[in-house]
Design a protein with these regions (language model features):
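C-terminal nucleotide
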Residues: 1-63, 88, 92-124, 220-381, ...
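A short glycine/serine-rich beta->alpha loop
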Residues: 53-54, 70-77, 116-124, 154-162, ...
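Glycine/serine-rich anion-binding loops at beta->alpha junctions
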Residues: 59-75, 155-172, 376-394
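Structural signature of FAD isoalloxazine-binding scaffolds in flavoprotein oxidoreductases
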Residues: 76-96, 215
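Beta-strand segments within the central parallel beta-sheet cores of soluble alpha/beta enzyme folds
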Residues: 100-102, 147-154, 183-195, 334-339, ...
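Glycine- and acidic-rich phosphate- and metal-coordinating loops
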Residues: 135-157
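Fold-level recognition of mixed alpha/beta catalytic cores in primary-metabolism enzymes, strongest
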Residues: 160-248, 430
């Protein structure tokens, strides 16, 4: 383990380039950018926590949802891929029992006293609640947790649908796992992070985001037993055929004030399930749902009914997407992507917020994508929780320059990311 100044010099000299290539690819320009980014993070760590500390550097990726929009929390299927946009954390353990985290772009220094357990008043929806909840998750797993100081620099857009929260959570979990030798498996870390987000942060998320950031690659998950989900890793290299790029567009809206909208999707799906005597839609047969349709409309309302239909269709579609990827049939996969996008509009109804119809960035981005890509081998859909944030598009090389240019003309410079997928999950880099 090196001190921060030594490590900064080594990174700048290229000593750790092989580690960076494993995460970010071989492009020389990207490796130079990551060297500078890591060195800047080390400098900021020294600024806030002092020079000469023995440090380690961790990385946790964001994720692109490939299929299974709002199915995981109903014990259905999920399909997602880790991406090269990530959170980097420089960390050093301490002996005073406090966790201190400074995140780039945020003025506040989070300070958590680990002797104070349980959710704290006024802390929910703030990053401190996630840290406290993750600490509790480690304790519940029988692991002793100590203090650490960390500086984080995230390229995962906040409120963008690339799951910045999961990247932050997994970064914190990776630090504890690494600094204190806890030895927990990636899936166990993911469940701890989901617990923290649900119980301490107060957002009813599923598990797929955390699993993808923890494990890396393309993850197919069956959440029939959410405590022990069945996981299948599909290597990321098999997704895109030659000449096809995955673009993610930040429409410059934010998920940050939309927790109630997200929660309503889960609540309405579970309202349908409860009427049919079950807890979640994954426990309901589709035939029983259709048989009860008249009564469900009256008791639960049409939006809840439509969202339940979305669940059944999207769940079947996600399984078909997995099969298409495993068979190397990108055309079949792309057709299913388009179907998923249409379902978000018509059934799940999470492309825009019904109380703010003036702002429909996702709708505009999808319409623009259709105008450029229709008739090609590409595809487009909304991703993530919805209502604001990002869309994704699979863009053939012949249209990539035009697509990128048009998207950034409408949504601003730097809004369109051409992503690589990442095989590694949350890891200690150095």
């Amino acid at each position: 383990m090196a001190n921060s100044a030594q490590l900064r010099n080594e990174i700048a000299a290229g000593k750790w380039d092989d580690k960076l290539r494993a995460l970010y690819g071989d492009a020389a320009q990207e490796i130079c950018r990551q060297r500078a980014r890591y060195c800047a993070a080390l400098e900021q760590f020294e600024l806030y926590f002092g020079p000469g500390r023995q440090v380690q550097v961790y990385s946790a990726p964001g994720r692109a949802e490939l299929g299974g929009n709002h199915t995981d929390h109903q014990h259905g299927y999920g399909l997602a891929a880790a991406v090269t946009l990530d959170l980097v954390a420089v960390a050093a353990h301490n002996t005073d029992g406090y966790v201190r985290v400074k995140s780039r772009g945020f003025n506040k220094l989070d300070v958590i006293d680990l002797t104070v357990e349980g959710p704290q008043e006024g802390e929910s929806t703030h990053s401190a609640s996630l840290i406290r909840g993750i600490a509790e998750g480690f304790r519940a797993a029988g692991k002793a947790v100590g203090g650490f100081d960390a500086y984080t620099a995230s390229d995962v857009l906040r409120g963008s649908g690339l799951s910045s929260s999961a990247a932050f959570e997994m970064g914190m979990a990776a630090i504890w796992n690494g600094e204190y030798g806890c030895g927990l498996a990636p899936a166990e870390l993911a469940k701890i992070c989901q617990y923290a987000e649900n119980t301490y942060f107060g957002k009813p998320s599923g598990l797929l985001d955390q699993l993808t950031s923890a494990v890396g690659g393309i993850i197919f998950a069956d959440f029939a037993d959410p405590q022990q989900p069945f996981l299948e890793k599909i290597h990321a290299d098999g997704l895109l055929p030659p000449g096809m790029s995955l673009c993610v567009t930040d429409t410059r809206g934010s998920h940050s004030e939309l927790t109630g909208e997200f929660a309503a999707i889960r609540q309405e799906m579970e309202l349908i399930a409860a009427f049919l005597g079950k807890k979640v839609l994954g426990q309901v047969t589709e035939s029983a749902f259709w048989a009860a349709l008249p009564a469900l409309r009256k008791a639960c309302g049409d939006r809840a009914v439509l969202r339940a239909i979305h669940y059944f269709e999207e769940n079947a579609r996600t399984l078909a997407q997995r099969d298409a990827l495993q068979a190397g049939q990108f055309d079949a996969f792309a057709a299913l992507v388009l179907e998923s996008g249409r379902a978000s509009f018509a059934l799940c109804q999470n492309v825009y917020c019904s109380t703010d119809v003036r702002h429909q960035g996702l709708s505009v981005a999808l319409a623009l994508s259709q105008s450029i890509l229709q008739g090609s081998t590409g595809a487009w859909r909304m991703q993530g929780g919805g209502f604001a944030g990002t869309i994704q598009a699979y863009v053939p090389q012949s249209l990539l320059e035009r697509y990128h240019s048009e998207i950034e003309r409408v949504f601003g410079k730097g809004s369109c990311y051409i992503l690589r997928l990442r095989e590694q999950g949350a890891v200690k880099v150095i």
